[in-house]
């Protein structure tokens, strides 16, 4: 989608922002210059999901409160927009892959405890898992950029949908990661589900059943202790987000604050009070 068109629509829609939404999405001038929370989302009812075409990262903050979330969004987008980080990532791109040009932070409709950082333009081919993995690794060894003080986790998101369209989301995301295969040695996988201010609660059992049905029986098997692949599913506000990653536990569940400042990674999943334990 044309970002210039999106920006023009943003300007046109701004005067019609609902008063309640305007209040909920207010940030100070200091932050608005750095993180332009997408106004094309601000007037949408809280139950509307993130646009399905957005690719990026689910971001949580070290501290609670909207101010902390905004600061975390600033940090996450600044890391992704860092010149040297983009140079380092571009060096590992596949030939013909379209890179992202910038990272843009926005609220997740219906959830003010977390944020979303989208990679633009929307038709980029960036591997969000590789980006998040690189950030964790750089934080562990001490990157040139300022170490994160506000971001807790930066979880890759390949695609999102309404919370009621989980089945369609899994059908869209998983086939490229789990193609049919007849190898005698199965590839292991697990499913991790968590909730943050969900509009509706879903049990991990139900999510595992729906998502797991889109992984072929032949050539794959569930391993909850040491899976090669982890299907990450995040339910925040009215949005269901999904990605497939490797080494989820080894990467500390993408907690970059912990990677930067703590030597020993915890086995618990960081997040808000409503987050469910890993499956």
Predicted regions and their residues:
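SAM-dependent transferase fold signal centered on methyltransferase-like domains
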Residues: 1-279
